[in-house]
């Protein structure tokens, strides 16, 4: 519907998924990413109950969150329903994180979804792909401002981006950080290397 989705298999990484020719995740190393975007904010925030995941249609982030008993609700806004269907078919060990009764999937534009939310979430995880194509609007000042309004006073936003260690990603990373720092009074960066 919105993007070309392919699933391949390799001896090194097992099955892996691509969107429009770009690798999104593989079954061998997706745990690194999922653990980093979940366990760091959960270690910092004392009482996360209500979570919004933007993207997240593979179920990996919600699967990690569901390990915490205090989680009461997870809203996943994944624009492309076909992405969810493909992940359920080819990555059942990851997509099991979509089957819990606390998880609600909305196939909707994330920016529009956020505009109607105020002071609602303890944690927002932007699990969208890198800032190009259909996800480009999820890396703007308006988007970060909408996230800020949707968070409770002690809420946390976590977002991912390309590696600042690669020249082709460095400028985009800098630009993203400036937008976030402009909106959020307290902003910190942490990194994980994913092969």
Which residues are covered by each model-predicted region?
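Short, intrinsically disordered, charge-balanced linker/junction segments flanking boundaries
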Residues: 1, 120, 191-195
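Short strand-turn-strand beta-turns centered on an Asx-Gly dipeptide
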Residues: 20-21
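The AdoMet/dcAdoMet-binding core of the Class I SAM-like
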Residues: 25-159, 166-173, 181
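Class I S-adenosyl-L-methionine
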Residues: 171, 175-195
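Active-site-proximal loop/turn and secondary-structure-junction residues that shape catalytic pockets
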Residues: 130, 163, 193-195
């Amino acid at each position: 519907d919105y993007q070309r989705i392919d699933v391949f298999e390799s001896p090194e990484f097992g099955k892996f998924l691509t969107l429009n020719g770009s690798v999104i995740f593989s079954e061998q190393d997706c745990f690194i990413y999922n653990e980093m975007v979940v366990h760091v904010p959960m270690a910092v925030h004392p009482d996360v109950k209500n979570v919004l995941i933007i993207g997240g249609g593979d179920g990996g982030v919600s699967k990690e969150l569901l390990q915490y008993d205090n989680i009461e609700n997870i809203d996943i806004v994944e624009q492309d329903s076909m992405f969810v269907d493909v992940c359920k078919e080819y990555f059942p060990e990851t997509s099991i994180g979509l089957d819990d009764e606390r998880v609600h999937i909305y196939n909707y534009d994330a920016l529009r979804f956020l505009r109607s939310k105020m002071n609602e979430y303890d944690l927002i995880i932007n699990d969208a792909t890198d800032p190009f194509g259909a996800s480009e609007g999820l890396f703007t000042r308006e988007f970060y401002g909408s996230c800020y309004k949707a968070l409770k006073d002690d809420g946390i936003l976590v977002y991912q981006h390309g590696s600042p260690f690669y020249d082709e990603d460095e400028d985009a990373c800098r630009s993203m950080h400036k937008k976030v720092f402009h909106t959020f009074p307290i902003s910190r960066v942490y990194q994980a290397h994913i092969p």
